[in-house]
Amino acid sequence: MEIINNSQKYDVIIVGSGAGGGMATKVLSDAGLKIALIEAGPYFDPANPDQMTQMKWPWESPRRGSGTTRAFGDFHMSYGDWKVEGEPYTIEKETSFRWWRSRMLGGRTNHWGRISLRFGPKDFKSKDYDGLGENWPISYDDIKPYYNKLDKLIGVFGTKENIFNEPDGFFLPPPKPRLHELFYIKGARKSGVTVIPSRLSILTKRINNTRGVCFYCGQCDRSCSAYADF
């Protein structure tokens, strides 16, 4: 094994470019620090024609649409698996724990449903409400300013509903309900069930000049070439 000396000097070295490492990189670099970001997987850009799988037909896959053992199919844009060779994590015998291991720029931010809900006051102090578990040493009010910053940074659509344990945030307009959803909403409200739009980190309007807006292709799992999802 060859060890290559690098003359560059950095203030911080961050291992992993996923949700934690990526956000730490942004915050520290915005503060003026020089960052070295180390990632086990390859560079990835969902708008790169050589990597993009969005809006492609099954016969355009490497296997021309035939079956694959790759988790979630050939067009799923998250390089990794439930188990990765060399992974150091272990579990007890006769137990099961499935956790997606993503090896690429962005890590598991390329593999999630973009559901962006806040923990509410009850979630931080559950023992006070049901006697189970332990309370967090912090409250929702302690975390609220950071939720607010994140909403504005990544863009989350939703509606303000004033539900105590589903705190409102800074929302973009939600998509209009489709016909079958209108039927669900009508039936639920007739039964006295509260129905609200989901809260997802998908842009329904522009928040900056580097990311586009969702065009409703329904292929978020293929990664967005318009950069409309986070």
For each predicted feature, which ranges?
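Extracellular/periplasmic catalytic domains that process cell-envelope and extracellular macromolecules
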Residues: 6, 103-104
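A short, basic/flexible loop-to-alpha-helix module at the beginning of a structural domain
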Residues: 1-9
